[in-house]
């Protein structure tokens, strides 16, 4: 009977390496999301993209600023995401702002539909990235901020900026003082030595004249 080699047996039983959950490359992010909304639960969704769209996205030509998400007939759709036409697409090029379907599990869609029934809750796109060579979109359940909340965010940003400036000023100040001390101390010591030498010379000259 033919015996199985140890190599083939070990290769079959060897575990396949797990795919990393860290994004390979972040292509675009919605910077205004944290300013305009209170973000809650996040979900990772896949996208149905065309070949010309993937080429444009690889060149980081994408804008999430005007994109929004809605649910229709138990499906999640991404609208107004801007992906420009690719220069080599030709007649097969895509519509830059076409509707794009998001790929989620059934239990995730059911959970999102339940949460979207709450008044004031919406879905917001956060980040567009590639993971293991596949396009992914990070979406979040969010609640809109009022004008007072936005003013508080601006105040917090200004406070953090002022604190960072104060820290930088404190860190730079000791270095400047050290440099001035290093530059001043050698000159003062040289001047003292020169004064002492001049006094010694004048004393010697006086002694000679007296003799």
From Swiss-Prot:
GO MF annotation terms: RNA binding
CDD domains: SmpB
Biased composition (Polar residues): 177-187
Identification of the protein by name: SsrA-binding protein
Annotated stretches, region: Disordered: 1-20, 170-211
Top-level taxon of the source organism: Bacteria
Function: Required for rescue of stalled ribosomes mediated by trans-translation. Binds to transfer-messenger RNA (tmRNA), required for stable association of tmRNA with ribosomes. tmRNA and SmpB together mimic tRNA shape, replacing the anticodon stem-loop with SmpB. tmRNA is encoded by the ssrA gene; the 2 termini fold to resemble tRNA(Ala) and it encodes a 'tag peptide', a short internal open reading frame. During trans-translation Ala-aminoacylated tmRNA acts like a tRNA, entering the A-site of stalled ribosomes, displacing the stalled mRNA.
A cellular component term, taken from the record's GO annotations: cytosol
Family annotation (InterPro entries): SmpB, SsrA-bd_prot, SsrA-bd_prot_CS
GO BP of this protein: trans-translation
Keyword RNA-binding: yes
Keyword field: Cytoplasm, RNA-binding
Entry's family note: Belongs to the SmpB family.
Compartments reported by the entry: Cytoplasm
PROSITE patterns, per the entry: SSRP
Coiled coil location: none
